[in-house]
């Protein structure tokens, strides 16, 4: 049967504003700048509140994934606001193409739009799986490079801020510096700069040096890692501002980068061919993508270490953890799959043994690869202090935070039992000058 939904045509590029749901605020802000560089008019949504969830429940079945409820509710709330010309507005949503129900969000969104009286609004699909060929956003090499740069930069900024903010002497210094660099990077990407490997290698040490120059007092704090379903893990709307809550409890938070999920998806393409057979072309392409990403991953790890920050484990080492620990097989790749288990193992091994596993209620991959692995990880690492938290329209924020507080109480008790290091640790000196003003171009003087 022929599809009757409206399509986003090339001529709409100049006439329509595209609304983007806000999953990963830092990375998506740079990604939005990349779309503007390609001639699109875009806006990253920031609306939140109870009405978003209520609209999601009204127009989507309540048994559907919580992230779907929120994304669709956020779109409908924005369209109801009166801020947009509804004849010149479009929406965009991602599709993984995997077995997770997230691949069906676009159909649920179209159905909800029709019910709500917005059936004329086209929806684009952002995917790398060849889905929605008549309504997908065109992917050229330049856009893919800019998208990767958005994630590289976003992960770096997120990591630097998270490891600086809990110890800063001047409240808000790390947040302001992150916003400063976001403004610079977005401006550069809009003007078709800043995303080449050469430019990123030159700029990243400068960013790290400025964060390292922020006056801090390194005192022992509870370190908490956050893992889980990708939307609930990163979105403040999806996890009730989990990172902000943990900061209010005087914790240092480690939120593994979004690039790990991209690498996970590429690795799974190659692993599928190895396990079940298939296209060698796809396997070769996936391995080439992993090699490309690994090159910049080394730059980020070196940048963090040189500036005195904790760096994540290389993906090539991360993929060994599940099978080395006999926890889960690499063929388990629905949703976040084995990556979720691997991230918990890495966090515990690197000193972030207190972990919040954020999961939408009823998310089968999370219950198997997250909650289902907790006992096994505790057997391997008795110090692991892991609490799974369900996020759902019916789950109250107070109950979620109380469960996290119980986990933190155990963490603080263990911290007090340890031998405390000196209150003021010497700052790590870097060879990169931190006295930088906003450059006219990131390419300047390279």
Predicted regions and their residues:
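An N-terminal assembly and electron-transfer interface module characteristic of large anaerobic redox
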Residues: 1-446
